Amino acid sequence: MSQNIPFIAFNRGIISELALARADIKRVALSAEIMTNWIPRTLGSMTLRPGLGYIGSTKDNLASKSIPFVFSQTQKARLELTANIMRVWISDALITRAAVSTAVTNGTWPVNLTGWTDNDEAGAASTWAAGGYMQLLGTGTAAAIRDQQVTVAAGDANVEHALNIVVNRGPVTLMVGPTVGSDGYIAETSLGTGVHSLAFTPAGSFWIRLQSRLDRAILVDSCTIEAAGTMEVTTPWDASDLANVRPDQSADVIYVACVDTQQYKIERRATRSWSVVKFEPEDGPFRTANAGTMTLTPSVLSGNGSLTSSVNFFRSTHVGALFAVTSTGQSVLKDMTIVLDATNSILVEGTSTDRAFTIDLSGLSGTGNTVILQRSFDDATWVAVSGKSWTVDAVESYNDALDNQIVYYRLLCSVYAAGTTTAILTITTGSVRGICRITGYTGGTLVGIEVLKAFGAISASDDWEEGRWSDYRGWPSSVALYGGRLWWAGKDNVNGSVSDGYESYDHTVIGDSGPISRTIGSGPVDTINWMMPLDRLMLGGQMAEFQCMSNALDEPLTPTNFNIKQRSTQGSAAVNGIKVDNQGIFTQRGGARVFSMDMDAGSLNYVSSQLSALVPEIGDPGIVAMAVQRQPETRVHCVRSDGTVALLVFDKLEEVICWVEVETPGAGGFVEDVCVLPSGSGEKEDHVYYQVRRTINGATVRYFEKWATEVACRGDATTLLADSYIAYSGVAATVITGLGSL
């Protein structure tokens, strides 16, 4: 029998046609079979979907992925990633560079370093290296330095300039200032391996300084003034990678994971200065230590050299990998070229002859230098050993006779006058764990290395560890910041950094603050599609969702208090999950259904539930991107592979789960991506951006189009309900420019 049902609320949204006959379900009477471009409110009313305002085009109209950057309410940006390029939008405008005639002399170093002044400190060396690099090799204390004064024409003074610096093997220290060695324009900063676009405004001519104190070769590829136009920073992610980019942000740094790609960092160094650099921890994480007979032999204790394997082991894809080699016995060496230069320490323990070590000094005679032996009981506070001071070459043995005490020793240059004095301490007991990174591949038994932590011997050792990440072993696919640690997951493993040390994975750190490394080890876990820092750290695997937890509620995760448990077997699609308060929302592995992860009040564990139960086909033919808008209400934008959007109006407390559809069919409108920036002070709505592919005048274009605010769509003098609109506000005019996008 027909009925007249009063529509008292429009916040039930779409219901599946499979459920239309369910008259026994109260919400069916208030639901719709079709609800397109209508936006319900939790309150019960609804409105026409606001228009989409034209912001600008993607680079070369290519497909892109937008990443929100939010430092504060007032400091926000949208990062546009296209194939191997990043551009930055601030307040809906791209960062651009001004046209200036200023130029760096010989900024790419094709054959030499002409134009750059050598100001190396004693013992350090800055040289040209094959491949067209500036090579900086410090001593650990003395710096290799190159300077250049750059002339600025009068008309370019007080105009913003930008340096584009490409670092092949970092880090390198940069300073830019009005005088040599000063940093009034760009404060002294460390530049990692990658690309840097650094803005500054000189009042006149300025000096660039590139330097390194590290006792390993640092390679800089180029240093040039950026050309006029949009700022573009090179990235490692090609077009096929964009859907797999997984970011998480801490202050000015966005950490980025991507399937089969090394981790990177996007760094904001100032509002208009950005970098994209490799994430390169120097102390781990490492795989399980070698248990076989294969040995590795470093050719040097420090600096740059080679690593030799006793069997055919290395692959070209090992380049970039870390290796740790633990020696039998300890040997430390230092070429002293400045006062207070010192060797690393050796540890002396045991009794009797086990405590004897050798002191070897060369290049000392006739220099006027003085070298002393120092002792420490904590490897931090040093005192001179009485009677152990040298001004000429010497080789001698020393035994302190402090049986059963743990003592550290080192050699120090207390007086420096000239030359290079080589100081070596050697003891046959104890061990040193050195760490290197592979820089080049020669063959299966030989690779080039840079030493990050000095080795203890140049003899073969079967006590070695391989780094967990490399092109050979694979890279993590997801990242999250949780509990004061930086977490990476993928390749069946989850790794958490040292507490409050996001770039340290040093397993020698003792106690609860040490790093965490665990195998997930259940089901297909090669790719972790997302990590969400909810009340618990959640991982989205291909066949299950995992919860990282301690033994007791609210205890922090530590190396000895860490467990991984399956909490759902729905499995996750290759779409980044999103966090809504303490709840997670993700796409089920089929790619079309949307689930939430909620804390169960009884078990205090996270469980999954379907948000699309009453309209299971809402995600068809597949969801490719998601983002959450919190103001004026919580709305989850789910971009579908057919170019439309499934929009979830959501309020957990009010039990509102309302699905509607959004489309923009004009000019073949096809939504490909979504990004949300939060509202700021005085703003009532978040900023929602769609990337829309359209056909304009027969050409394919891709526009960023921004949702209008609801207040601008209420029928006032300005009503912004059109799509790809451009609004003009000003004096009466017969000609309006800037309409090329139409």
Where are these predicted regions, by residue range?
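N-terminal beta-propeller domains
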Residues: 1-98, 261, 265-304, 331-333, ...
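Predominantly extracellular/luminal cell-surface or secreted proteins
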Residues: 89-91, 175-181, 226, 326, ...
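Beta-strand-rich solenoidal segments
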Residues: 90-101, 219, 224-298, 395-409, ...
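Extracellular and organelle-lumenal recognition/adhesion modules and their flexible linkers in secreted
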Residues: 97-229, 342-346, 353-355, 367-372, ...
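Short beta-strand segments and strand-loop junctions that repeat across beta-rich extracellular domains
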Residues: 107-111, 265-270, 368-381, 410, ...
